From Swiss-Prot:
Localization terms from the record: Host endoplasmic reticulum membrane
Function of the molecule: Plays a role in the modulation of host immune response by down-regulating the surface presentation of HLA-G molecules. Selectively targets HLA-G molecules for degradation by a mechanism distinct from the one used by US11.
Protein name: Membrane glycoprotein US10
Gene that produces this protein: US10
Recorded coiled-coil stretches: none
Keywords carried by this UniProt record: Disulfide bond, Glycoprotein, Host endoplasmic reticulum, Host membrane, Host-virus interaction, Immunoglobulin domain, Membrane, Signal, Transmembrane, Transmembrane helix, Viral immunoevasion
InterPro entries for this protein: US10 (IPR035128)
């Protein structure tokens, strides 16, 4: 117990300061600290995942909804996305289920984004993720992120193997086109 005059003791001050830091660090903020996402369009189908890190008040009461926005006017052209989610007190993973794209004019805009909205009685958060085409370098990276969240490590290895083999074939072809022929032994 603290005695009168014990607050002059540096050890007691240090202990009280440390308890204050721990109490402040474990205080429930009721909002995510940060999030990561991986959303990709492959064969005219959107798939993605959003992972949130932080402290959530009660994961069971969070309601999630997601929308795909296409083009410049985000409110005019939007399409609902089905969401599956699992959450704990410190992190949440929301999978955007495969959704076929429907473009209003028949052509595909270049800039898609997915919006995940989480709501409960006393908090409301919106997370916007860019969506990339699978044929672009960022699309490959987002696809790898999505597969990592799903835990599909076999598919990740297939992509890396395909990239490695493709790079080897392209490099050899460029060397042959430039006139370099490897010496024979």
């Amino acid at each position: 117990m603290l005695r009168r005059g014990s607050l002059r003791n540096p050890l007691a001050i240090c202990l009280l300061w440390w308890l204050g830091v721990v109490a402040a660090a474990t205080e429930e903020t009721r909002e995510p600290t940060y999030f990561t996402c991986g959303c990709v369009i492959q064969n005219h189908v959107l798939k993605g995942a959003v992972k949130l890190y932080g402290q959530f008040p009660s994961p069971k009461t969070l309601r999630a909804s997601a929308w795909l926005h296409d083009g410049e006017n985000h409110e005019r052209h939007r399409q609902p996305i089905l969401v599956e989610g699992t959450a704990t007190a410190t992190e949440a993973l929301y999978i955007l289920l495969p959704t076929e794209l429907s473009s209003p004019e028949g052509n595909r805009p270049r800039n898609y984004s997915a919006t995940l909205t989480l709501a409960s009685r006393d908090c409301y958060e919106r997370f916007v993720c860019p969506v990339y085409d699978s044929g672009t370098p960022m699309g490959v990276l987002m696809n790898l992120t999505y597969l990592w969240y799903l835990g599909d490590y076999g598919a990740i290895l297939k992509i890396y193997f395909g990239l490695f083999c493709g790079a080897c074939v392209i490099t050899r072809s460029l060397l042959l086109i430039c006139g370099y022929y490897p010496p024979r032994e």
